[in-house]
Amino acid sequence: EEKESEYNIIYLFQPAEENGSGAAICKPLFEKYHVDKIFGLHNMPNLRKNVIYYRPETVMCASVGYRIALTGVQSHASEPEKGRNPVYALSAFAKAIEPLAKQTGFQPFTFENYHFSSLAMITIIHMNVGSLNFGISPANGEICLTLRAAKENELSILERYVRSYFEGLKEEFEVSIEEFDRFDENYADPSLVEKTIMKLKSAGLEVEQLSEPIRASEDFGYYKRFAPSMFVFVGMGTCPSLHHDSYVFDDEIIPTAVHMFQVVIR
């Protein structure tokens, strides 16, 4: 529009968005430019096209990936009692967390002696024991998990549970735990949301509040450590979901996204 803003504006094009590592690279920008607030936007299939969707407080969940390896003792398949095969320990853990794999809502619940105020879940994304060798009772096995929670402090509860479980196996197995792809809770500052939504409505943009957070994660949540933040979605209408083989970005939502940022800048 060739108009000057009374604010200094930084356009942040962040790398490595999919694994949670890129946001941390951008930390020096907040210190250098003294950022007062930050806004983010993402397209979203299967929400009404060209509508801005928002939420105060939790917008998207916190999550982290764990890779847990157990090493026991190999033996001949005819003498499994002489070895320590990790398959039973890993299978017992997989069965124990099955209720957490079935959590889909954001209501309070209790798992064993752990209490959660909202969604908390664990997804098994990989599990492997031994190899295709019918003469061996294997010594090695691993399980890989995505831990996810609406609240960061409750993601920490899930982490304590998992670590405690495998700490209890250290007399029988060598245990290794690696961490991957940590994402903070994507949290929208309620005051910033209220002010911004009023401005968007006044500018003629259609807005709608999400009834609950999105279960996926987004490393935009990291930025709330440095400034009040707000993250919204632009609906794409009915179409294949993000990351689906048939997904195609719809250019027709770009003007809505640009208009939203123009309003924010003003």
Question: Predicted segment positions?
Answer:
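Histidine/acidic-residue-rich, glycine-tolerant segments that coordinate divalent metal ions
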Residues: 3-126, 130-137, 217
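A short small-residue
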Residues: 69-77, 140-148, 174-179, 238-245
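Histidine/acidic residue-rich metal-binding segments in metalloenzymes
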Residues: 88-92, 96-100, 109-114, 136, ...
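A short beta-alpha structural unit
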Residues: 123-130, 146, 175-197, 211-221, ...
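Oxyanion-binding "anion nests"
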Residues: 124-128, 133-178
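Zn-dependent metallopeptidase/amidohydrolase metal-coordination segment
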Residues: 208-265
